[in-house]
Amino acid sequence: MKKYDLIYCDPPWQYSNKVSNGAANNHYQTTSLFDLKHLPVHTIAAENSVLAMWYTGNFVQEAFELAKAWGFTVRTSKAFTWIKFNSLAHERFDKALQNGTLFDFHDMLDLLNAETKMNGGNYTRANSEDVLIATRGNGLERMSASVKQVVFRCLGEHSQKPWEVKNRLEQLYGDVNRIELFARDMSQGWDAWGNECPNNSIEFTGPQFITKAVTID
């Protein structure tokens, strides 16, 4: 079986809140933490490898538990932080520039704050999402020291993550064997696996996971 140096994933977390979980299930199939833990990721991970995993503030503990269950040790909980802008924020920025309503730096900051996505939250309203990095063995050598943490991107389709993060991971770790789990489509240079992915590159067997893994060159 092919082994991967870099494993990137956005797990389909199952919310305990019925409203939140129902909203997620309207767009994709969610999976319990128990079943996620039993996905045999350790069988495809190289002896020295890196896991980059998306999670929200509701799933901090679960993300750490899942990384451990897959054989990884979390090294940083905030390798990347995506600041979410409303899907049409770019149009309103362009309009403000054309109309001359941005007079100074403070105007720009006000508009940036106004255009960040306002999600739910029991304390503050969430408008960011994080990627942790965990390692197995010695992990991977860092190929670039100029990769930044914060990603500013507009929202796409429901739960769709910005392509910029995969690009930065490529810069960070170079040309290694890499795969995206729970993928919805294929990316050049990446293998992929997921029940919505048109061409899977590997086979996983488990309680809910039987499918097959493909690389786009």
PLM feature spans:
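Class I S-adenosyl-L-methionine-dependent methyltransferase catalytic core
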Residues: M1-D217
